[in-house]
UniProtKB/Swiss-Prot annotation:
Disulfide bond positions: none
The protein's name: UPF0178 protein BCAH820_3075
HAMAP family attached to this UniProt entry: UPF0178
Origin species: Bacillus cereus (strain AH820)
NCBIfam families tied to this protein: PRK00124.1
Length: 146
């Protein structure tokens, strides 16, 4: 198993790095050049930089990921592609994407886009909380223990 993180705006990178390093599982953070950092990463953690274009990180993750790798993303499109490839896919708020829930998530995203396109406003996501982080940590630990 390898772990790939859609790292632009991912609020749980610290949890992923800490828990994966402890378990000696390699982590690849995929992020745009606009988030470039000279920060030293622990052994087993790699950062790949991609262009800032739409979906560039998603495409790179899909090139790299293999069946049974673990992907962390908030992007439903990437989650859908990764599930089809046989990957385990987690959202940073602590839930697992499945073949059963991805259809509804994609449909909701589409309907919200149609509402916005018609000039109306839609609600954004709720703020990320400490409870969300702990929920993610518990799920992540259970997934890497498999």
């Amino acid at each position: 198993m390898k772990i790939y993180v859609d790292a632009d705006a991912c609020p749980v990178k610290d949890v992923i790095i800490f828990e994966a390093t402890k378990a000696e599982i390699p982590v690849t953070l995929v992020t745009s050049f606009s988030h470039y950092s000279n920060a030293e990463q622990p052994k087993g953690v790699e950062t790949i930089y991609v262009d800032s274009g739409a979906d560039a990180a998603d495409y790179r993750i899909m090139q790299l990921a293999q069946k049974e790798d673990l992907i962390v993303t908030q992007d439903y499109g990437l989650a859908s592609l990764a599930l089809a490839k046989g990957c385990i896919v987690l959202h940073h708020k602590g839930y697992k994407y499945t073949n059963e829930n991805i259809e509804q998530l994609l449909q909701t995203r589409y309907l919200s886009a149609m509402v916005r396109k018609s000039g109306k406003r839609t609600k954004g996501p709720k703020p990320f909380t400490a409870e969300d982080k702990e929920k993610f940590r518990a799920l992540f630990k259970s997934m890497i223990a498999l």
